[in-house]
Amino acid sequence: MDNSFDIYEIKARQVLDSRGNPTIEAEVLTAGRGYGHAIVPSGASTGTFEAVELRDLGKKYGGKGVLNAVGNVNEIIAPELIGEDSRNQRLIDNIMINLDGTENKANLGANAILAVSMAVARAAADTSSLPLYKYLGGCNSYIMPVPMMNVLNGGKHAGNALDFQEFMIMPIGADSFSDAVRMCAETYQSLKKVISEKYGKDAVNIGDEGGFAPPVKTIDEAFSVLLEGVKRAGYENEIVFTLDSAASEFYDEKTNSYVVLGESLSTDKLIEIYKDMVSKYPIVSIEDPLFEGDFEGFKEITKELKGIQIIGDDIFVTNTNRLKKGIEMNAANALLLKVNQIGTISESIDAANLASRNGYGVIVSHRSGETEDSIISDLTVALNSGQIKTGAPARGERTAKYNQLIRIEEELQISKYAGKNFKIPF
């Protein structure tokens, strides 16, 4: 009997994310000397229904320490998983879910559980002498995703007047992933020059995800700057736009309205603004256009904006129960997949498969508080998702994901870039 895949050791520690806040890292070693490690990211604009990220709430690190989560791995999770076959990902994830005993992983912490879940997958892949994307996805994993690169920041990711959180570019006209990265990087540098000329050298500040955060005051002004950057780079026919509104962040539950640039708007009025934007600019996708609890509103905007990808992030939180409700109602037509919203690799894959089976697009995503861990790069190829959202072509925690995808594309030799078929790439 081959016991080389059996888990031999698990340990966790507190490390830092890209915002200088603590997060948790886990390491897993198998009997066959397979090694896996993982570092968990953290969000700024988080959905109400996300799994719970356990924080210490003590004096150190302003209450954001994760030593309790680290202790939960070392003292509770590890003893239960030692000796388990690392290939049994679903069994291992279920053991941790049952150990926690809550629907939202509030006892042990989704950050503790996810760190181990990801590290186990890596350890099993290493023991198998397989790259992680091939271990998770098999021989049919060959589609390289279209990157959604965040180049202009607003909302919680910046300090300007923009309420909408992310203005992104998608190089759907590229021939390969590496070509797509080049187009975006060139556009990013072009945009930097445009911003510097228009607002001054001090205006090329960047937000949490590497995008610029110039002092733009209106949505039209933001798109005007973006268009000029793309034009100067020479990619007007290759690059389109996508928007993350993060609308729950500017929604007022007391008045059931959205406060945009100081004006109070109804759901219908906000939808009209989106329709106007789509008519004026090459926008192909909008994420979280409305409040996270408004399934009816998502149904309406999906119907009104035919041909536009409407992505559910905060409304679905990578949770199959919430996604099923959306599918039944035709609310949105794509899922933003964030592994730390749900807390295990198995549940993340379940959500992606549910979305794909029902014709929903899948966008594998980072968080604003990221790390050098590039597991989402392998995951997007494993799932053939066709889309990845992981920030600007800047800051090491963002470029780590793009660089890993460049390596994967080179290793695959025969791959397919999703391009214009980004929503349903296979």
UniProtKB/Swiss-Prot annotation:
Keywords, alphabetical: Cytoplasm, Glycolysis, Lyase, Magnesium, Metal-binding, Secreted
Active-site residues per Swiss-Prot or TrEMBL entry: E209 (proton donor), K338 (proton acceptor)
UniProt binding sites for (2R)-2-phosphoglycerate: Q165, K338, R367, S368, K389
CC annotations in GO: cell surface; extracellular region; phosphopyruvate hydratase complex
InterPro entries per record: Enolase (IPR000941), Enolase-like_C_sf (IPR036849), Enolase-like_N (IPR029017), Enolase_C (IPR020810), Enolase_CS (IPR020809), Enolase_N (IPR020811)
Sequence positions that bind Mg(2+): D244, E287, D313
Enzyme class: lyase
Catalytic activity: (2R)-2-phosphoglycerate = phosphoenolpyruvate + H2O
Sample GO molecular function, one term: magnesium ion binding
Signal sequence interval, chain numbering: none
Cofactor field: Mg(2+)
Pfam (any one): Enolase_C
EC numbers on record: 4.2.1.11
Compartments reported by the entry: Cytoplasm; Secreted; Cell surface
Cofactor: record remark: Binds a second Mg(2+) ion via substrate during catalysis.
GO biological process: one example: glycolytic process
Database matches in Gene3D superfamilies: Enolase-like C-terminal domain (3.20.20.120), Enolase-like, N-terminal domain (3.30.390.10)
Pathway: Carbohydrate degradation; glycolysis; pyruvate from D-glyceraldehyde 3-phosphate: step 4/5
UniProt record similarity statement: Belongs to the enolase family.
Function comment: Catalyzes the reversible conversion of 2-phosphoglycerate (2-PG) into phosphoenolpyruvate (PEP). It is essential for the degradation of carbohydrates via glycolysis.
Protein name: Enolase
Species this chain originates from: Methanococcus vannielii (strain ATCC 35089 / DSM 1224 / JCM 13029 / OCM 148 / SB)
